[in-house]
Regions:
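C-terminal accessory regions
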Residues: 1-2, 122-236
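Conserved helicase motor core of P-loop NTPases
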Residues: 1-107, 113-116
Length: 236
């Protein structure tokens, strides 16, 4: 399927109309949810109920939502808020500007911190929140890191992240919202990158027409190819 996407061929799997219909043995699934509101509802239901029940997985450890845009109802910001409220509604919390962090939240480091030995793209789980002193303690793989008040700005919620941020990483299960409202980002390489981040299963949630729009649009690939051609011409 990934090769077909690069070639601009292929259509999404036959869409299903409810997360309840998902087949645990199917590698690629498309759930029809053509409005942002329906998309958010389906994504949160997958994370909270369907996937843990049908696949016996931990949504924090095994599921990663990848989205094309930060803003909007089905954007990364609102996805993080809705998934957090669904999976982790009661943890002690601390706000940093407009960003809320709760005990039990999945978070991502957004820049390299050599002193703490954590790097851009590292993911962890908030183990404790000290809202009085403005400190957060995070469990990364094999290590526990304390963030002081000013260091918390280097963290972002990570229930949902951008497709761009996911490059170089892999996850057991990827959920990929894909809507016409994402039209500015609907490109072939976006779908290819999202699909190939999944080790076991990818679940598209959204409008099949948006998938088709993305597959037909290879503008980024064309620009990259043209750049290579120009650079090669300059060197000769």
């Amino acid at each position: 399927m990934a090769h077909g996407i690069l070639c601009g061929k292929g259509s999404p799997p036959s869409p299903i109309d409810s997360p309840e219909e998902i087949n645990p043995g199917q590698d690629v699934t498309f759930i029809r949810a053509i409005t942002p509101e329906l998309c958010i509802e389906a994504v949160t239901k997958l994370c909270r109920q369907i996937l843990p029940r049908k696949l016996s997985i931990d949504p924090n450890q095994d599921v990663q939502v990848l989205a094309p845009l930060h803003r909007g109802i089905a954007g990364i910001g609102n996805l993080n808020d809705q998934i957090r409220d669904s999976l982790n509604p009661h943890g002690a919390s601390h706000s940093m500007g407009s960003t809320l962090f709760r005990e039990g939240d999945k978070v991502i480091q957004t820049r390299n911190n050599y002193d703490k030995d954590v790097f851009n793209g590292d993911m962890g789980i908030i183990d404790s929140v000290d809202s009085i002193n403005g400190k957060i303690e995070i469990l990364f793989e094999g290590k526990r890191i304390i963030y002081e008040r000013m260091e918390i700005a280097d963290l972002q919620p990570a229930y949902a992240i951008s497709v761009h941020k996911s490059q170089g990483s892999e996850y057991p299960i990827v959920i990929f919202p894909l809507l016409k409202q994402h039209f500015m980002m609907l490109q072939r390489n976006l779908v290819y990158t999202g699909l190939t981040r999944a080790k076991k299963k990818v679940i598209f949630v959204g409008d099949p027409a948006a998938y088709s729009m993305a597959i037909r649009n290879d503008k980024t690939l064309v620009r990259q190819t043209d750049l290579v051609r120009k650079l090669t011409k300059t060197e000769t």
